[in-house]
């Protein structure tokens, strides 16, 4: 099923630690027409995360049943957990003329581009691999093994950057935010 819509689908992808989630939050604050897509996941909630605001938390069985019912626009298994985008919520926002912002990986981006119209895909690169590793270490949320896994995943993720409409290096947060917002505004004008 192809989703046709009145709003734009804006995809932000990047390796973990590149600033994608912070950029997404900042975009939502400066653009009243943007809404964040809320994913479903089988991972455990982190401290402060709220059901229906940060994620829809599902058991593995619940998630697999939703997959069987074709309720996801896209889904993937990442680090032993499932993540997916519920179709119904996205369609509701798009039909209201709102743009939906996705904070997802390359697999999800590829699936959405295949199943929806008016998609703008933006890939965010770190200034360098060394800076990316430093950012991950500075977070102090992962052990050494997890950091190595994230770095391997980052290399894989970055190998797909050429599949995106735009590629931006996040070496200055405010400038990167400005560039992304300018892209969104320009794409709105092209689409309608």
Swiss-Prot record:
It comes from the Bacteria. One of its GO terms (cellular component) is cytosol. It catalyses: GMP + ATP = GDP + ADP. The keyword Kinase applies. CDD domains: GMPK. Keywords: ATP-binding, Cytoplasm, Kinase, Nucleotide-binding, Transferase. The lineage of its organism: Bacteria, Pseudomonadati, Pseudomonadota, Alphaproteobacteria, Rickettsiales. SMART domains: GuKc. It is found in: Cytoplasm. This is Guanylate kinase. PROSITE patterns: GUANYLATE_KINASE_1, GUANYLATE_KINASE_2. Belongs to the guanylate kinase family. GO terms for molecular function: ATP binding; guanylate kinase activity. Disulfide bonds: none annotated. InterPro entries: GK/Ca_channel_bsu, Guanylate_kin-like_dom, Guanylate_kinase, Guanylate_kinase_CS, P-loop_NTPase. Pfam families: Guanylate_kin. Residues 7-185 form the Guanylate kinase-like domain. It comes from Rickettsia felis (strain ATCC VR-1525 / URRWXCal2) (Rickettsia azadi). ATP binds at residues 14-21. Essential for recycling GMP and indirectly, cGMP. Its EC number is 2.7.4.8.
